[in-house]
């Protein structure tokens, strides 16, 4: 057995600990830590696990509502969806691993978030993903796109959960640090939810699932640092996933949970056995004693340090009722999984690690989490840019050419090349999968349905973090509303650059202020989430990307709305005000070659009023199609409705703002809807009585999109532009 290395300043720095943090450790334990103890502190005090740069700001977010059963602090958030059922969901990042090893990084990102959900007793029913890649022409990007797509697809498909939605966009600032955020959703009975809080002294602590290897050691620490030029040397820190083992683990856990044997349960995710054991003990005000000789290992000669920090996948830690241990073992053996009693709960609030007859660590368990450094980092708030007057922008090309270019651009073009690798229909409950405003799934055999979405407009967040944060929430709220769902709750994934840069910290604070204000105004609490900082590569920070995942409920899923034009002759109505806002728009960036201007202002009261009105129309089956307007504005939104239905449309262009601003401006709180002609006037009158702008702007029908007198574009030309960009870009890629 090799001797532990001496503790030197270089070793401390290699563990991601700053000199003042190491001094804090010395003060806390009154001595020099052992090598194993240094590894434990490194794991528990890194950014990924401790939230040391973000914790003071996260406290400001709204997390409570009458329908919230469990907010942030557990494996996932839990909300009441009626009839004794709960929806359990969360989003997390696997950004750094997916850049280093895209297939395995993305696959284990899916596996990790699924475990967070079924750890709490829920059966996963859906997953989503938010992907951000660099410039498409970057030499690594095809490899990264192909690897991430195959990783998500292979894990989700093999495990047996449908991947039903998400968002994929591109920006050169992600060249060296792509984003892979995975969201999972599960359903459980409200009286059968399990938590990570250990109770009872002397209860056995049980290791369950796959064996421990050397993969993923210091994965959480790697995720808490910016990339430098040696990123590929970190491939050993990327975990390797086995979706079939995870499926067995799911079934074994759910079966065991019905026996009354489980007191507490925690999946082994970031920081592995260390984090799961410390969290269970600290939450229950108990100590934890582990004997690592009992840990099932797949590699010989593993040290205590390696076993504690391994992030091997498909593993769980449980506190069991002692009298149920034999029954629990039988369940796991039946499913072909490892089961080992590796420790016990104690009453001394110590985290004690034994290995090969020696005590390798003896630390105060509460302080490992509670005494982690908390930073109020310096920040510089982003000043709001100047508003761009639409009439100062001269269209460089015709409106028809602009529409074709936008609909075939990387951000707006079809992502079918990616999503066709996902099974969106497995389990048989998917009503609407990728491509709609929100995914829609049926809940069991009853009438209810869940609507799910995940997205963010990082352009807005960079231009004005406060307004961008508000818009990220309202976009999720609108996406859910557009399918007829009542928005209930949010999970977030806050992806930002280096928090030690005051500009980046200012972006973080600004976005959180906007997110918090919007969630409060819309009764849309945040119940779970993740913070991913240090998303930077060789000094280049990513744009602020606070991903918002939303969940909504339909009491009758058969009344849900979709965006496709259903028939010719329907009236087209525009709900909401159109001023022609071009600042920070895709038209300005992709057509005019400019990245400036203030993003659109979000009116939260108006958002709520229009959304509530629209849901009523959908519930009463007054509409035949609904689509929320975001990137690319009205023209792009109408084009997507036409493409989905295979039917064209003609609209009029009023003269109150320039035509290009009317067609491509990105004003918020707007929906494009279709209705039977005889219903249109009644809808317009009802809207105006509520103070909601509603204009009849056209009719559906024909093989073209007729944009007033400005442009006529064939649906087939739009389809070609929309569908061909990504397959053409990816031609010839072979995944090794």
From Swiss-Prot:
InterPro entries in the cross-refs: PRibForGlyAmidine_synth_PurL, PurL_linker, PurM-like_C_dom, PurM-like_C_sf, PurM-like_N, PurM-like_N_sf
Active site: 48, 94
EC number(s) from the headed UniProt entry: 6.3.5.3
A cellular component annotation (GO) from this entry: cytoplasm
One GO term of the biological process aspect: 'de novo' IMP biosynthetic process
UniProt keywords, alphabetically: ATP-binding, Cytoplasm, Ligase, Magnesium, Metal-binding, Nucleotide-binding, Purine biosynthesis
Sequence positions that bind substrate: 93-96, 115, 239, 311-313, 532
Enzyme class: ligase
Complex and partners: Monomer. Part of the FGAM synthase complex composed of 1 PurL, 1 PurQ and 2 PurS subunits.
Function of the protein: Part of the phosphoribosylformylglycinamidine synthase complex involved in the purines biosynthetic pathway. Catalyzes the ATP-dependent conversion of formylglycinamide ribonucleotide (FGAR) and glutamine to yield formylglycinamidine ribonucleotide (FGAM) and glutamate. The FGAM synthase complex is composed of three subunits. PurQ produces an ammonia molecule by converting glutamine to glutamate. PurL transfers the ammonia molecule to FGAR to form FGAM in an ATP-dependent manner.
Family designation: Belongs to the FGAMS family.
Record HAMAP family: PurL_2
Protein name: Phosphoribosylformylglycinamidine synthase subunit PurL
The organism of origin for this protein: Beijerinckia indica subsp. indica (strain ATCC 9039 / DSM 1715 / NCIMB 8712)
């Amino acid at each position: 057995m090799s001797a532990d290395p001496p503790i030197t300043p270089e070793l401390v720095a290699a563990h991601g600990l700053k000199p003042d943090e190491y001094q804090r450790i010395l003060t806390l334990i009154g001595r020099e830590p052992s090598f194993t103890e240094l590894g434990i502190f490194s794991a528990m005090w890194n950014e990924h696990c401790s939230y040391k740069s973000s914790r003071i700001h996260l406290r400001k977010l709204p997390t409570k509502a009458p329908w919230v059963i469990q907010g942030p602090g557990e494996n996932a958030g839990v909300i009441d969806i009626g009839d004794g059922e709960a929806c359990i969901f969360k989003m997390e990042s696997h950004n750094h691993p997916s850049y280093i090893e895209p297939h395995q990084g993305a696959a284990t990102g899916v596996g990790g978030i699924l475990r967070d959900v079924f750890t709490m007793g829920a059966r996963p029913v859906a997953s989503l993903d938010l992907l951000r890649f660099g410039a498409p022409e970057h030499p690594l990007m095809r490899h990264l796109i192909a690897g991430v797509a195959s990783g998500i697809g292979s894990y989700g498909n093999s495990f047996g959960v449908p991947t039903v939605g998400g968002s994929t966009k591109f920006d050169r600032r992600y060249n060296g640090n792509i984003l892979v955020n995975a969201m999972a959703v599960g359903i459980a009975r409200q009286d059968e939810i399990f938590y990570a809080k250990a109770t009872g002294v002397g209860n056995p602590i049980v290791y369950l699932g796959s064996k421990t290897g050397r993969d993923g050691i210091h994965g959480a620490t790697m995720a808490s640092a910016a990339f430098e030029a040696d990123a590929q040397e970190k491939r050993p820190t990327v975990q390797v996933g086995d979706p079939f083992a995870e499926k067995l683990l799911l079934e074994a856990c759910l079966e065991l949970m019905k026996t009354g044997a489980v007191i507490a349960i925690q999946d082994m995710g970031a920081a592995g056995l260390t984090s799961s054991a410390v969290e269970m003990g600290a939450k229950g005000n108990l100590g934890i004693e582990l004997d690592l000789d009992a840990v099932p290992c797949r590699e010989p000669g593993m040290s205590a340090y390696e076993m504690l920090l391994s992030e091997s996948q498909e593993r769980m830690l449980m506190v069991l009722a002692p009298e149920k241990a034999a029954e629990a073992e039988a369940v796991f053996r039946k499913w072909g999984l490892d089961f080992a009693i590796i420790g016990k709960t104690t009453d001394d609030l110590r985290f004690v690690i034994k290995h090969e007859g020696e005590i390798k660590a003896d630390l105060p368990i509460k302080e490992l989490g509670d005494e982690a450094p908390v930073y109020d980092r310096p920040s510089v708030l982003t000043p709001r840019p100047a508003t761009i007057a639409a009439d100062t922008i001269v269209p460089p090309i015709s409106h028809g050419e602009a529409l074709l270019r936008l609909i075939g651009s990387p951000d707006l073009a079809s992502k079918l090349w990616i999503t066709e690798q996902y099974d969106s229909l497995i389990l048989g409950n998917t009503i609407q999968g990728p491509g709609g405003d929100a995914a829609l799934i049926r809940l069991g055999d009853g009438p209810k349905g869940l609507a799910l979405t995940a997205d963010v407009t990082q352009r807005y967040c960079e231009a004005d973090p406060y307004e961008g944060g508000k818009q990220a929430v309202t976009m999720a709220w609108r996406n859910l509303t557009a399918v007829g769902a009542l928005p209930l709750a949010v999970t977030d994934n806050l992806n930002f650059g280096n928090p030690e840069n005051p500009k980046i910290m200012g972006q973080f604070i600004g976005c959180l202020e906007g997110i918090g204000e919007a969630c409060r105004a819309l009764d849309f609490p945040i119940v779970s989430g993740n913070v991913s900082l240090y998303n930077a590569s060789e000094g280049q920070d990513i744009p602020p990307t606070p991903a918002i995942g939303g969940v909504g409920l339909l009491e009758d899923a058969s009344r849900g709305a979709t965006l496709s034009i259903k028939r010719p002759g329907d009236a087209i109505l525009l709900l909401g005000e159109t001023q022609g806002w071009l600042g920070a728009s895709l038209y300005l960036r992709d057509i005019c070659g400019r990245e400036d201007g203030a993003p659109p202002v979000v009116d939260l009261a108006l958002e709520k009023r229009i959304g509530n009105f629209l849901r009523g129309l959908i519930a009463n089956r007054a509409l035949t199609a609904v689509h929320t307007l975001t990137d690319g504005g009205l023209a792009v939104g109408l084009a997507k409705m036409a493409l989905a239905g295979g039917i064209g449309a003609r609209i009029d262009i009023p003269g109150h703002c320039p035509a290009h601003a009317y067609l491509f401006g990105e004003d918020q709180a707007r929906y494009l809807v279709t209705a039977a002609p005889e219903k249109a006037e009644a809808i317009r009158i009802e809207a105006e009585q509520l103070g909601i702008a509603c204009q009849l702007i056209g009719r559906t029908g024909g093989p073209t999109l007729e944009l007033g007198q400005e442009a006529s574009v064939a649906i087939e030309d739009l389809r070609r532009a929309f569908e061909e960009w990504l397959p053409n870009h990816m031609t010839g890629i072979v995944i090794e």
